């Protein structure tokens, strides 16, 4: 691994040593986006000189192995994978029942009886020895983490395998924890970002119960000033002008997610694409109603129901996701997509519908001209 202790500024033609080590020719990272990013998307982005990523946080180890292998078959360049490091949800049957009762009208209209209980539909990397074994076997160039940090033994094993490690921070305290844990870079996620907020679990003692909601620009400046690791900006960045702005603030690269959803290589369905191209893209909401953790998506009826005044607190993450997915599946069977989780950032209306390689090339031209 290169020395990444001094983030510096990324200027035209001068990439940070970490990006050079990864073989990147552009300071652009495609966000992992579990359920939307595909091997085809990640490979196309990497082949274009940026860094593609797979979102494997909700995938079992065998599926992760297959996706990594499929990506490697499509590119000889570096790519990354992302995993979730949330604390397992403590069983709370009373909270689950209250949440299901609140969602009962949506189940009724779908012709469903609310389930008797909710399940933790996927686990955490913290307790996933099989996933660690897959990573050590396949050795992707980058492994990044959301919702917290892996265990020290996991970090050591991955580093010994020559893997570059990154984690998401939404506050200065989280960034300091990432630095103290010995990781190689920080992904600074502003409040504008689509999908799940990467906040550390409160029980880790790193973060406060209240989300400070820092925007990307402010967060990047804070982390560049008060940490020594390279900072990758994430949240609301949709074009080369946005990338240039983040580099000017001291970030070494920019991570874009929503910008890639309309690419034909993404797994986004027709309804998701239509909403992203429609008026609804101007109205994203940060809500815990879908999964149990705060996440930004295009407003829909499930979000409206979940965020009603006086509504109970959603079931714990990812147990609330169990209810949301059942509702979405039933509604989709009727061609009703108003309960689906269409994650998107605040810059969603700026999305362009282009093949991934063409989008990366356009971003590079815009960056050069900015």
In which residue ranges do the predicted regions lie?
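Active-site entrance/lid segments in N-terminal catalytic domains of soluble metabolic enzymes
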Residues: 2-226, 363
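Conserved active-site-proximal phosphate/metal-binding subdomains
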Residues: 104, 196-232, 237-370
């Amino acid at each position: 691994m290169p020395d990444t202790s001094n983030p510096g500024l990324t200027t035209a033609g001068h990439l940070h040593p970490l990006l050079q080590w990864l073989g990147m020719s552009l300071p652009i990272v495609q966000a992992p986006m579990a359920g939307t990013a595909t091997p085809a998307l990640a490979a196309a982005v990497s082949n274009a000189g940026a860094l593609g990523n797979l979102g494997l946080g909700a995938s079992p180890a065998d599926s992760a192995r297959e996706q990594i292998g499929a990506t490697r078959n499509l590119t000889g360049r570096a790519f990354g994978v992302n995993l979730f490091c949330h604390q397992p949800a403590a069983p709370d049957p009373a909270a689950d029942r209250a949440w299901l009762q609140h969602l009962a009208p949506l189940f009724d209209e779908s012709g469903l009886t609310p389930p008797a209980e909710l399940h933790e539909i996927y686990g955490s990397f913290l307790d996933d020895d099989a996933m660690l074994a897959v990573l050590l076997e396949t050795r992707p160039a980058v492994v990044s983490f959301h919702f917290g940090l892996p265990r020290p033994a996991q970090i050591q094993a991955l580093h010994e395998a020559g893997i570059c490690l990154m984690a998401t921070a939404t506050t200065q305290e989280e960034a300091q924890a990432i630095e103290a844990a010995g990781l190689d870079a920080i992904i600074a996620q502003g409040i504008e970002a689509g999908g799940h907020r990467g906040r550390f679990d409160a029980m880790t003692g790193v973060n406060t119960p209240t989300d400070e909601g820092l925007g990307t620009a402010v967060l990047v400046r804070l982390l560049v000033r008060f940490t020594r690791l390279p900072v990758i900006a994430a949240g609301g960045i949709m074009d080369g002008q946005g990338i240039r702005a983040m580099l000017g603030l001291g970030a070494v690269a920019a991570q874009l997610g929503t910008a890639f959803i309309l690419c034909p290589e993404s797994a986004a369905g027709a309804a998701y694409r239509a909403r992203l191209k429609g008026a609804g893209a101007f109205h994203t909401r940060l809500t815990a109603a879908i999964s149990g953790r705060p996440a930004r998506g295009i407003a829909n009826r499930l979000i409206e129901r979940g965020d009603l005044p006086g509504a109970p607190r959603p079931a714990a993450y990812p147990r609330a996701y169990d209810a949301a997915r059942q509702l979405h599946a039933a509604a989709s069977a009727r061609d009703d997509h108003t309960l689906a989780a269409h994650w998107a950032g605040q810059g969603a209306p700026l999305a362009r519908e282009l093949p991934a390689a063409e989008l990366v090339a356009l971003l590079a031209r815009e960056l050069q001209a900015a």
